[in-house]
């Protein structure tokens, strides 16, 4: 059996299904390039048939990423598979991931198909997909709750048709480690041609066991691919956390005896990028990528670490990409120094125009705060990346008046569909007044579900990172804005969220795998 563990990242597909985590095409490309630097084996870039926006994002990623294999999800029908193949065509190497439900409940209530019909459709789908690529993954949706005999029949059939990866998902996060590993092992033992495919696992974290289930399936069940997301991003309680499974296998190689090709020094940069783009803040005590993951408050622990790091640290912070905050640039730094630092941070801008816009914003920030950190530079690029072609709203300027005992007043200037407009309003505070001023001109009718503020670096001069979550007509989106002025950051975040609400191309199907 292979001693290589394949890391299949689905941040851009299953991760994006987390309410509010929708991303623009440009944001997806940035994450895909970071995943390539992370050296993940497979990037599931989306679900091509679900929307034109997803199709275009997959195609753009297929054109941009060269070293990782690009994958698209597709239901088990010719239309979906053809659409996936078309989007993936620019990629040097690609995979089609097709699926159909196999549990009695799903077949009867959702598909309204008999087991024989599902069996036949699964086989035909894999056969059709083989016309486009030799790399086919098949998932029996709700496989962990399917009848064992029928599940084995379907999987044997799709392997015979050419499926090269079989993924057994725990769709609702119900499994426990020993039981899930036993399921994988039992299915593999019962299927005569099981050695013709790589066995994969895809776990959800509803009971907090996604990582444990995945690792048990690898160690005890013989799985050799784990499907996961950066920061465990995903709907409900999330998916298997990439950083946790990778570091578990690498740190405990004595136990797992498996190789992983991931460049672990890119884990924290990937975590920060996904967090900034989605607005989902990483909890401080999150394993590997949380702010406190390598912090020691106990005096005894601190003393031990100072004498010998391995007394209380099983991993080194620098091995996963943690670096100390350090001043890298200032107001006298030139364009070439800025460009070089972007390259050192692994940030690629597609054009001179994008570089010029980011540099202009950097100079503006340097006039506002004396010390510029790497985190500030990443935030600048993230902020500029939101200004995609065809955006509806863009922040221009803000003025406010607030005195004790009086209602604050805000006046904001922003671009709406190419035209500069000015809104004025009062509110319960400066932020409320500013958002009311935007709504006085936009009248979006959206409901605000969340408002949060996070400091990007330390100190009173730190940039504030604001996340605003809006809901309208069943759609939930996040907007993120950064600025040393928290109120200005709030306005930018609100406008970013409104832009996503206006983007109809992001409306799509969200399959449960």
UniProtKB/Swiss-Prot annotation:
Gene Ontology cellular component list: cytosol
Sequence ranges assigned to domain Pyruvate carboxyltransferase in this UniProt record: 5-268
Primary subcellular site in the record, as a coarse category: cytoplasm
GO biological process: L-leucine biosynthetic process
GO molecular function: 2-isopropylmalate synthase activity; acetyl-CoA C-acetyltransferase activity; manganese ion binding
Subunit description: Homodimer.
The protein, known as: 2-isopropylmalate synthase
């Amino acid at each position: 059996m292979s001693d290589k563990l394949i890391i299949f990242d689905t941040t851009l597909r299953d991760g994006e299904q987390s309410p509010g985590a929708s991303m623009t095409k440009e944001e997806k490309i940035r994450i895909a390039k970071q995943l390539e630097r992370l050296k993940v084996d497979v990037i599931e870039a989306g679900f091509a048939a679900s929307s034109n926006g997803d199709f275009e994002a997959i195609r753009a990623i297929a054109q941009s990423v060269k070293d990782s294999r690009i994958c698209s999800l597709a239901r088990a029908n010719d239309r979906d598979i053809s659409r996936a193949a078309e989007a993936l065509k620019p990629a040097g190497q690609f995979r089609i991931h097709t699926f159909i439900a196999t549990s009695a409940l799903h077949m009867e209530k959702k598909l309204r198909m008999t087991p024989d019909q599902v069996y036949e459709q699964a086989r035909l789908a894999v056969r059709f997909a083989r016309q486009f690529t030799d790399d086919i993954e098949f998932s029996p949706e709700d496989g962990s709750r399917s009848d064992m005999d029928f599940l084995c029949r379907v999987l044997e059939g799709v392997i015979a048709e050419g499926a090269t990866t079989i993924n057994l998902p725990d769709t609702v996060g119900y499994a426990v480690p020993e039981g899930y590993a036993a399921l994988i092992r039992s299915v593999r033992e019962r299927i005569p041609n099981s050695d013709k495919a790589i066995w994969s696992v895809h776990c959800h974290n509803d009971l907090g066991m996604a990582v444990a289930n995945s690792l048990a399936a690898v160690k005890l069940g013989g799985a050799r691919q784990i499907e996961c997301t950066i920061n465990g991003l995903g709907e409900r309680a999330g998916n298997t956390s990439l950083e946790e499974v990778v570091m578990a296998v690498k740190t405990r190689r004595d136990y797992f005896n498996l190789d992983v090709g991931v460049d672990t020094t890119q884990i924290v940069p990937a975590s920060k990028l996904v967090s900034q783009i989605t607005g989902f803040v990483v909890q401080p005590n999150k394993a590997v990528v949380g702010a406190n993951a390598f912090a020691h408050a106990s005096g005894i622990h601190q003393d031990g670490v100072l004498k010998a790091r391995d007394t209380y640290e099983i991993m080194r912070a620098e091995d996963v990409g943690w670096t100390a905050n350090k001043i890298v640039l200032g107001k006298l730094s030139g364009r070439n120094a800025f460009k070089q630092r972007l390259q050192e941070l692994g940030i690629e801008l597609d054009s001179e125009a994008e570089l010029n816009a980011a540099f202009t914003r950097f100079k503006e920030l340097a006039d506002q705060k004396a010390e510029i950190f790497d985190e500030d530079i990443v935030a600048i690029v993230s902020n500029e990346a939101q200004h995609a072609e065809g955006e509806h709203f863009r922040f221009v300027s803000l003025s406010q008046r607030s005195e004790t005992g009086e209602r604050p007043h805000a006046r904001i200037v922003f671009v709406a569909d190419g035209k500069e407009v000015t809104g004025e309003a009062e509110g319960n505070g400066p932020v409320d007044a500013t958002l009311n001023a935007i709504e006085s001109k936009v009248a979006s009718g959206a409901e605000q579900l969340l408002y949060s503020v996070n400091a990007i670096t330390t100190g009173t001069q730190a940039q504030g990172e604001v996340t605003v979550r809006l809901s309208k007509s069943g759609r939930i989106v996040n907007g993120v804005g950064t600025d040393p002025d928290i109120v200005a950051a709030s306005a930018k975040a609100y406008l970013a969220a409104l832009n996503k609400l206006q983007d109809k191309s992001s409306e799509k199907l969200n399959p449960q795998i």
